[in-house]
Amino acid sequence: MNFQSNISAFLEDSLSHHTIPIVETFTVDTLTPIQMIEKLDREITYLLESKDDTSTWSRYSFIGLNPFLTIKEEQGRFSAADQDSKSLYTGNELKEVLNWMNTTYKIKTPELGIPFVGGAVGYLSYDMIPLIEPSVPSHTKETDMEKCMLFVCRTLIAYDHETKNVHFIQYARLTGEETKNEKMDVFHQNHLELQNLIEKMMDQKNIKELFLSADSYKTPSFETVSSNYEKSAFMADVEKIKSYIKAGDIFQGVLSQKFEVPIKADAFELYRVLRIVNPSPYMYYMKLLDREIVGSSPERLIHVQDGHLEIHPIAGTRKRGADKAEDERLKVELMKDEKEKAEHYMLVDLARNDIGRVAEYGSVSVPEFTKIVSFSHVMHIISVVTGRLKKGVHPVDALMSAFPAGTLTGAPKIRAMQLLQELEPTPRETYGGCIAYIGFDGNIDSCITIRTMSVKNGVASIQAGAGIVADSVPEAEYEESCNKAGALLKTIHIAEDMFHSKEDKADEQISTIVR
């Protein structure tokens, strides 16, 4: 174990900072993020992971607990509620609240060589669009879900899957009015809390680990599933979008439907299964005020790192082959598919425009164009669009410029969003929005909220869509949206079977295989 913080450094840091990290780092060989969370009795706020062994993006897991600040949108304004002082700050824009946080709390960040050492983590819902683009109206139906919810946690566990290093970070908070002895008391109290947390990790608590063959489960039927769309109404709206395309209003529109299914499994059980069934570069479990979010997204929205901007447009998909030869054949087939390539080119143009609005003139480039990247179950055509953030432009402005992703709206983006607000019967909530971390250092990583479940009061909500173009067949587009939801319904089916329907049998089958 390597203790990186000492009281002398803490006292020196306290002269210019009010929020100071206490850090301990050690290396593990068997302890995993899932085991850690079970040892904490699942009393966490979020888990962010990258889990796809074939992807170069997969390396870290971040566990946040003990939130001290909650940021959310309320009636067009953003508020930050401090759980300790019970104070409340409000501002007109998200970046205003984040600037207030950094100025007020005077946060020092540890230098650990990892991409995230603390900050605001949560979601921006699709329904936030009218706050960013006033020409897009709010949906006519109400939703009880906040348009934005971000948590700033006192404690962060950062797990490096490559080095097996685990960093425990505890942010000690000062007011700036303490005496030296009072500062020492704060240090010792936070150090003790950190030690207690680490001791829980060393606990020999028996953790039940999943043993399952995900391939043995077929995608379940939709018998117990309800939708906000009748099939005939969905197909009629496909025809309406095609008429708008024919009239020249848009080139593409992404029409979606929301499925709901009653469940017995809890959200973390769903997450444990999802990370096996559908591992992806962006995986997340979040415990909100009144619901939980579970997701596995393959697609980045935007990445901001020290002023470097990056978007990875994804469009064009094939399933992985059974062997190398079939994989290669499918890659060639995908790259010859003119429809898939045309959609991809459109998304690259959208990404260039999104970055161009906030980038230094002449800095936008496409260093990788139409590259095929393989994931665990599928392969995608992916490009990389980059730029350099303009001086004086806030990193959150880059996030807002890219939000929402064109892959979930269509193009041109604004007109497509206007039409979708008219056609879709209910607000999208998280679907098509983003999950993001906004670091204390201003760096951001975010993914598009797809392949995601929202769990509330024993009901899982799943939304999936289809990209409508001029020659779309309504029946096929309806089936595509159902097929996309099927992967998550499969997750629910497995979790119910493993944890609830056959609990006695499950206990016998549980063994160490996947962490």
From Swiss-Prot:
According to the UniProt entry, its GO molecular function terms are: anthranilate synthase activity; metal ion binding
Question: Which positions in this protein are listed as binding L-tryptophan?
Answer: 50, 281-283
Q: What is its EC number?
A: 4.1.3.27
- GO biological process assignments: L-tryptophan biosynthetic process
Manner of cofactor binding, per the entry note: Binds 1 Mg(2+) ion per subunit.
Q: Where does Mg(2+) bind?
A: 343, 480
Q: Which Pfam families match?
A: Anth_synt_I_N, Chorismate_bind
Q: How is its activity regulated?
A: Feedback inhibited by tryptophan.
Q: Which domain of life is it from?
A: Bacteria
- Lyase as a keyword of this entry, yes or no, is yes
Q: In which pathway does it act?
A: Amino-acid biosynthesis; L-tryptophan biosynthesis; L-tryptophan from chorismate: step 1/5
- EC class name: lyase
What are the binding positions for chorismate in this chain?
Answer: 316-317, 431, 451, 465-467
Q: Which cofactor does it need?
A: Mg(2+)
The UniProt entry's sequence similarity note says:
Belongs to the anthranilate synthase component I family.
Assembly description: Heterotetramer consisting of two non-identical subunits: a beta subunit (TrpG) and a large alpha subunit (TrpE).
Query: What is this protein's function per UniProt?
Result: Part of a heterotetrameric complex that catalyzes the two-step biosynthesis of anthranilate, an intermediate in the biosynthesis of L-tryptophan. In the first step, the glutamine-binding beta subunit (TrpG) of anthranilate synthase (AS) provides the glutamine amidotransferase activity which generates ammonia as a substrate that, along with chorismate, is used in the second step, catalyzed by the large alpha subunit of AS (TrpE) to produce anthranilate. In the absence of TrpG, TrpE can synthesize anthranilate directly from chorismate and high concentrations of ammonia.
State the protein's name. Answer: Anthranilate synthase component 1
What is the phylogenetic placement of the source species in the record?
Bacteria, Bacillati, Bacillota, Bacilli, Bacillales
Which gene is the coding source of this polypeptide chain?
A: trpE
